[in-house]
């Protein structure tokens, strides 16, 4: 394992250690946060079976100490040796869960034998219904329209884009907020060039940016209402058309035209 990988693990855990107990409700860490920066399969497996074990244990300990839910992108390997790119969820006083597995895999992941997910369900924590997307999932609007149909309250995106311009990531995140009709929370590591990759960002259902880390490393904190909705203005001079944007779209959807 090269030193940058350990530095990244240490950076994340040190930021968690600096959070005061009771000061936040939800913490989100990027895709592959336990093996970020690996260069090949052997290196990934080395850290997954080594330092990653202590890192994941730290996530649970910090969730217990802070009293917050921690969501983190994790590479996992089951007892049969199957690799998956998943969202790990750590709740105070409860066993960790992995409610979502990355469904859309890039070719390098498939070549490593990583197995894609086969479902995209919501999971509920403290009365909030969450959906998830991991990196490449982000580029498939039908996933987000699916979450809109399920009435997600919040969609969490954990990512590790290395080449995408940050402006594109901002544009797409705002578009996904409209696709789902709910708040989008995106966590991703910054790259060496501020204009490439990164873009940890929170976007409200109306497409407005709540918080944005841009292309630089750091921690952003903010308040948001997980049950917020975009209320569209009246149209056609009908005052009763002032409705939840998402609810106004659902009855008009015609999936039979484009999902055959």
Task: Give residue spans per PLM region.
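Active-site-proximal loop/turn and secondary-structure-junction residues that shape catalytic pockets
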Residues: 33-34, 76, 104, 136, ...
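Structural motif
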Residues: 25-26, 130, 154
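CN hydrolase (nitrilase-like) catalytic-core segments centered on the catalytic cysteine
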Residues: 50-71, 139-220
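Active-site/binding-pocket entry motifs
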Residues: 34, 106, 228-230
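Cys-nucleophile CN-hydrolase/nitrilase-fold catalytic domain and related Cys-dependent amidase chemistry
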Residues: 2-92, 163-178
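Active-site catalytic loop in hydrolytic enzyme cores
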Residues: 78-150, 164-171, 233-239
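C-terminal beta-strand edge segments of enzyme domains
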Residues: 122, 190-260
């Amino acid at each position: 394992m090269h030193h940058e990988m350990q530095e990244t693990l240490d950076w994340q855990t040190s930021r968690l250690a600096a959070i005061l107990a009771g000061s936040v409700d939800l913490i989100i860490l990027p895709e592959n946060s336990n093996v970020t920066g690996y260069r090949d399969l052997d290196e990934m497996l080395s850290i997954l079976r080594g330092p990653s074990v202590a890192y994941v244990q730290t996530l649970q300990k910090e969730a217990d100490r802070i009293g917050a839910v921690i969501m983190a992108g994790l590479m996992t390997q089951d007892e049969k040796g199957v690799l998956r790119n998943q969202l790990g969820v750590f709740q105070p006083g409860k066993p960790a869960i992995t409610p979502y597995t990355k469904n859309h895999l890039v070719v390098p992941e498939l070549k490593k034998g990583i197995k894609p997910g086969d479902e995209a369900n919501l999971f509920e924590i403290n009365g909030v219904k969450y959906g998830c997307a991991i990196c490449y999932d982000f580029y498939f609007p039908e996933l987000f329209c699916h979450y809109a149909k399920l009435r997600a309250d919040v969609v969490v995106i954990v990512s590790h884009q290395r080449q995408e311009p940050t402006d594109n990531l901002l544009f797409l995140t705002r578009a996904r907020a409209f696709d789902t009709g709910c708040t989008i929370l995106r966590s991703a590591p910054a790259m060496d060039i501020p204009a490439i990759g990164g873009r940890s960002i929170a976007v409200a259902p109306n497409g407005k940016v709540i918080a944005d880390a841009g292309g630089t490393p750091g921690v952003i904190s903010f308040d948001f209402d997980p049950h917020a909705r975009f209320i569209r203005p009246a149209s056609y001079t009908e005052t009763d058309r002032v409705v939840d944007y998402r609810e106004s779209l659902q009855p008009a959807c015609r999936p039979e035209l484009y999902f055959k």
